[in-house]
Regions:
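Active-site neighborhood of HAD-like aspartate-dependent phosphohydrolases
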Residues: 1-43, 57
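Metal-dependent phosphoesterase signature
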Residues: 54-91
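Short, acidic loop-to-helix structural element flanking the phosphoryl-transfer center
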Residues: 77-105, 111-116
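Hydrophobic "anchor" residues on beta-strands that sit immediately upstream
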Residues: 4, 104, 129
Length: 138
């Protein structure tokens, strides 16, 4: 039987905190919310954006939709590239592939972003399966 090893993207393969927290701050500033230190926004690493905007900043559903739009406005051209692959990850993936393991990425981040980040860092060919959410959060 072939083994499949799944990895998350954010916080596992890449340190995406700088790009995510800067985009969150951009969205909150757009809505006239206070400025937060990047460390205060680390709670946005992982969970779905809309729900986290509502929980963290007390936004209404409509405001959270606007926050997500603003987040993505900055993320699409800038924030997506404000991250880096953790040290040793390329070597680990290569080792696992050489030992016959199937590798996959499963992320709550939209699939188009997952694929672009993996492409940007030259990692996409190391994965047999890449799964992310849709832009609408499904």
């Amino acid at each position: 039987m072939t083994e499949l090893i799944l990895f998350d993207l954010d916080g596992t393969l890449t340190d995406s905190a700088p790009g995510i927290t800067r985009c969150v701050q951009y969205a909150l500033t757009y809505l006239g919310k206070p400025r937060y230190e990047p460390e205060e926004l680390n709670c946005f690493l992982g969970p779905p954006l809309k729900e986290q905007f509502m929980k963290f900043a007390g936004l209404t559903e409509e405001e959270a939709d606007t926050a997500v739009e603003q987040y993505r406005e900055r993320y699409n051209g800038i924030g997506i590239y404000e991250n880096e692959v953790y040290e040793g990850i390329p070597e680990l993936l290569e080792f696992l592939k050489k030992h016959g393991k199937k590798l996959g990425v499963a992320s709550s981040k939209p699939q188009v972003y997952v694929e672009e980040i993996l492409r940007h860092f030259g990692l996409e060919k190391r994965f047999d399966v890449i799964v992310g959410s849709e832009l609408d959060g499904t």
